[in-house]
Amino acid sequence: KRMTKIGIYGMAVWLLSACGNGTPDYDATGTFEATEVIVSAEAAGKLLQLEVEEGTRLKAGEEVGLVDTVQLYLKKLQLEASMKSVESQRPDLAKQIAATKQQITTAQREKKRVENLLAAGAANQKQLDDWDAQVTLLQRQLIAQESSLMKSTNSLTEQGNSVSIQVAQVEDQLNKCHIQSPIEGTVLAKYAEAGELASVGKPLFKVGEVDRMYLRAYVTSEQLSQVKLGDKVTVYSDYGNSEQKAYPGVVTWISDRSEFTPKTILTKNERANLVYAVKIAVKNDGSLKIGMYGGVVWKKENP
């Protein structure tokens, strides 16, 4: 409650000082905020590196830390060895059935020779029937051999696919050991240090996109019709000592639900119990800070 009273008092003092210095009567007030992301560990292990400090500027995708990868790397080597073992067991179909095919070719040649001899009266029907049976037997053996080899090949293929998936999983886990900034921005807080043990989900640092700030202001239902997405407005910031500065802003979001007026916010209509939140994007010149009070004036040319 004490903090709420301080917030209300601070907002009231700022509004009174702004009015006393010729600043336009604000249509809405609020506080500045930025897009903030808490970067958490995606892998468990010893935190070998975390090269960020509060105020550090980061680019999107920039690597800033590393979780120990030794065990995962060894597991990957083991899986790769298993993959080589599986591949070495894969049969060479052509070589495996080459001998049987050669036997079939030889038997067919002998069968043809006996057919010619039988036609010349130099062989009997039983000899021809024997070679015919031999060819049929060898052909059946070839079919059975091919079927067995295909089953073995398919089984090895499935084993190989399973190992490949496990390798991909380990590679994904290895990638997650490399800590990166998801957005371009400034480090706002640091929650861990190199040498500590990281667990999945452990917060490491917070980064904020402070180059573009947002004034979260609140309007009454009567004012809502005056505000549209894309409207250009003028935003005023509070630098203390009755010093304000104007910034061009653009309305980027309007809540579709009303809420009770936050206790730290003063509205155009002091009796309004329900308000709608709006967000106004402002390019930061380096002076705007998260949590700073601000006001907004709708430009008359907005339709």
Question: What do the predicted segments below correspond to?
Answer:
Residues S40, R257-K268:
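Short, solvent-exposed secondary-structure boundary/capping segments
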Residues V219-P248, A272-V296:
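Surface-exposed connector loops and short turns at secondary-structure junctions
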Residues D25-Q89, A120-Q127, A189-E193, T220-E222, ...:
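Long, amphipathic coiled-coil "stalk"/hairpin helices in large membrane-associated assemblies
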Residues L15-A18:
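C-terminal motif of bacterial Sec signal peptides marking the signal peptidase cleavage site
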Residues E63, T69-V70, P203, E209, ...:
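Short, surface-exposed secondary-structure boundary micro-motifs
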Residues P24-D27, L74-Q89, L93-K95, Q102, ...:
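Extended amphipathic alpha-helical segments
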Residues T31-F32, L47-E53, R57-E63, A168-Q173, ...:
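Surface-exposed patches in structured soluble domains
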Residues G20-G22:
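Bacterial signal peptide processing site
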